[in-house]
Amino acid sequence: MGGQTVWMTLSFKLLLYYCMISLLMPAIFILATRAQVDKFRKFNESTQTKSSQELFEEAFEEQGYYLQRLFLQYGDNGTLTYEGLQKLLGSLGLGEVSVLEIRHGEAKHPSQSISHSHSHEDHHPSQGTTNSPPLRESLDAKSALSGSPAELGRSDYFLHPALRNKQEESVSLLSDHPTEKHLHGNCLNVTQLLWNFGLGQASHITPAHFTFLCPALLYQIESGVCLRHTEDHSQASKTSEGFLIALGWASLALLVISLPSLVALGMAPLLQPSVLQVFLCPMAGMAVGTLCGDALLHLMPHAIFSQHTDHQNAVFKGLSVLGGLYLLFIFESLLGLKQHFKNLKRRKHDAECGRELDALQGTSSANQNESSGHGHSHGQAEPGQTGIRSMAWMVVMGDGIHNLTDGLAIGVAFSQSLTGGFSTAIAVFCHELPHELGDLAVLLSAGWPVRRLLVFSGLSALLGFVGVLAGSALGNHWASHSPWILTLTAGVFLYVALADMMPEMLHGACGSVSPLKRFLLQALGLLTGGAIMLCIALFEDHIAVSLGENSLGEN
């Protein structure tokens, strides 16, 4: 019983303590919060008081430091001479017009072609010419560090106290100087710059004087009036020189790239048909993989993500890819229509000849049936032969257009830079061998002899050199059109791969290769071709041959 009483007493005391703590905690929290608020308020007030007194002092000290560094380097005894200021302007690229050589693909410095005199009234129409200039008003005004915020905008407020003893000298030089008409759009030399600020009488430029010149120097640097691009007077001669250099390198690269065609033609007679079929299955897949990979991983990213490409421009470049697809579709469709009408005309002519022959010979009904059967058999066999022939011609023309676009891409790349041209040539070379072997598979299945393949390979290579000539000319004379050529090339590559090569992979004759083995070989070739193009796209900068030159403009 006694234990229960003690337990109840302890429980009552604990409950009482808990209630007291629950009541006191909000009050303690409020007092602590108020103390923190008061402390923060006092700190903020002290910071504001410190800022109003010391903020600009620190700015003055920083300004004085940089002025001291400049005057130590270009001045003498704390002042700048005429020669010292001229040396400073020369190190900044000011004081005289200098020629700036612009490389292809680089952004040009924004320059203005303004070279006329204008009045200060153009910028301040509300101020008459008889009034004192605002600069002099700010120089005559007196202010203290504790001045009002309205006084902070005056020029003398931002002068370091150590420099204010030079202010009277500045005012005396600026007071009688007319500021109505100055050449602000020209590249000012030292004499013109000093005359604009009324400092022509000053034998030495003090730090106070120099603070007046700084905005003019910054404007001259930002506007680029002292820069003149080489395109203004000497780009024509360098364009012709760059065209010849690009044409030479691109032709040499295309000559090396054309070697896989000869290799493929040399390998064909040495291999048995069954072995050649097994070898060509992965090669056809590799041709599709390299063509699609080159278009999607190399050409389109280079064109769409070029410099100064906005969203609308990127959309139109994507439309250019679609234009390449449509262009080759129209070309091959016209080729097929021509072959179709030619076959119709041939059938009609054969039928008329057969009827005339039957009428002249007066053959028996049995002979007529035999002749009719022959005509029917020819009609049945001709569509298949026509389909194979049309496919072969489409592959030949597609290969010619492919080489033409290859030449365009290589010519444009070499016209922009040698390293970029070699990088594009490496990419084209990597997919040229499987592409040529894939074309060879289609043409051999159509029954083309090796001699005919050799002739058309030579004609296709000539189209490549035509593309090199056109690409070099476009890249040098119309460099802004280079991305559009790349996107058009990408569209042609996609069409050749997906419309010509892919159907042959899916529906072509298997020969002695089983369907499963054929599928595995084609899938392996497709992945290999895509992997090759991916590696080139990712490590293009590493595999590009460095010649110590970034552009043809340096040659």
UniProtKB/Swiss-Prot annotation:
Bias type Polar residues, positions: 363-374
What residue spans carry the region label Disordered? Answer: 108-148, 363-383
Establish whether keyword Cell membrane is in the entry: yes
Q: Where are the transmembrane segments?
A: 243-263, 315-335, 409-429, 453-473, 483-503, 519-539
Q: How does it sit in the membrane?
A: Multi-pass membrane protein
Identify its protein family.
Answer: Belongs to the ZIP transporter (TC 2.A.5) family.
Originating gene: slc39a5
A molecular-function term among this protein's GO annotations = zinc ion transmembrane transporter activity
Question: Where does the source fall among the domains of life?
Answer: Eukaryota
Q: Which BP terms in the Gene Ontology apply to this protein? A: intracellular monoatomic cation homeostasis; zinc ion import across plasma membrane
Where is it localised?
A: Basolateral cell membrane
Q: Sorted alphabetically, which keywords does the UniProt record give?
A: Cell membrane, Ion transport, Membrane, Transmembrane, Transmembrane helix, Transport, Zinc, Zinc transport
Its annotated function is as follows:
Uniporter that transports zinc(2+) into polarized cells of enterocytes, pancreatic acinar and endoderm cells across the basolateral membrane and participates, notably, in zinc excretion from the intestine by the uptake of zinc from the blood into the intestine. The transport mechanism is temperature- and concentration-dependent and saturable. Mediates zinc homeostasis that is essential for venous angiogenesis.
Sorted alphabetically, the Gene Ontology cellular component annotations on this record are: basolateral plasma membrane; plasma membrane
Which effects follow disruption of this gene?
A: Homozygous knockout fishes laking develop normally until 48 hpf, when they develop cardiac ischaemia.
Q: Which residues lie on this side of the membrane: Cytoplasmic?
A: 264-314, 430-452, 504-518
The main location is: membrane
KW Membrane (keyword) present: yes
InterPro entries referenced in this protein's UniProt entry, alphabetically: ZIP, ZIP_Transporter
Which reaction is catalysed here?
Zn(2+)(in) = Zn(2+)(out)
Alphabetized PANTHER family for the sequence: SOLUTE CARRIER FAMILY 39, ZINC TRANSPORTER ZIP5
What Pfam families has UniProt attached to this entry? Answer: Zip
Extracellular compartment segments: 1-242, 336-408, 474-482, 540-555
What is the name attached to this protein's record? Zinc transporter ZIP5
